[in-house]
């Protein structure tokens, strides 16, 4: 039997060990089990919805993400598994340089790849220590760029003279404020 490269025949499999004292020929028998555990079943990249956040006040395509909001989706709701995020695939495979604070991660350019969108690498570890890998795309969405210098709207006080209260149609500046952007609305 090759003890450094033994392939189990069943799962689990009991292995018996015989220890023999070479000086006095005394023998002791022990046993242990070989158990093969499956890696966790997790969502794969094409099944995971990208994590998107609006750009912060500065339009620089970087913002802070709480990556942990995706833990439940990735693990299919298994709260006993550990979810670890990495910036590179190599780090994930080696289990090094995990993102220290996944609750407050700012997207960044890594290894020549753009910061937006950014692909993160995810390792999920089950209770047996088996690991499964996937990816998570994070994307910073641009903020609308409205025109902020719309003209004042003036009306004469005809409705109830002297109370200085009138009914305005404030949508008359809407097209100017939207500034031709598609997919936005003014509220």
Label every PLM stretch briefly.
Residues 1-187:
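Extracellular low-complexity Ser/Thr/Asn/Gly-rich intrinsically disordered segments
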């Amino acid at each position: 039997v090759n003890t450094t490269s033994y392939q189990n025949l069943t799962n689990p499999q009991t292995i018996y060990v015989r220890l023999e004292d070479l000086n006095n020929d005394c023998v002791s028998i022990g046993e242990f089990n070989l158990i093969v555990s499956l890696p966790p079943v997790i969502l794969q990249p094409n099944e995971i919805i990208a994590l998107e956040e609006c750009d912060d006040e500065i339009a620089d395509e970087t913002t802070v993400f709480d990556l942990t909001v995706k833990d439940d989706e990735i693990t299919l709701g298994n709260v006993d598994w550990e979810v670890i995020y990495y910036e590179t695939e190599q780090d994930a495979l080696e289990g090094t340089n995990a993102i220290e604070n996944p609750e407050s991660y700012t997207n960044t350019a890594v290894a020549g790849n753009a910061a937006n969108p950014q692909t993160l690498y995810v390792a999920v570890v089950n209770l047996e220590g088996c690991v499964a890998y996937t990816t998570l795309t994070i994307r910073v969405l641009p903020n609308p760029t409205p025109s902020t210098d719309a003209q004042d709207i003036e009306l004469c006080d005809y409705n109830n003279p002297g109370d200085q209260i009138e009914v305005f149609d404030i949508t008359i500046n809407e097209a100017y404020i939207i500034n031709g952007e598609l997919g936005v609305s003014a509220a």
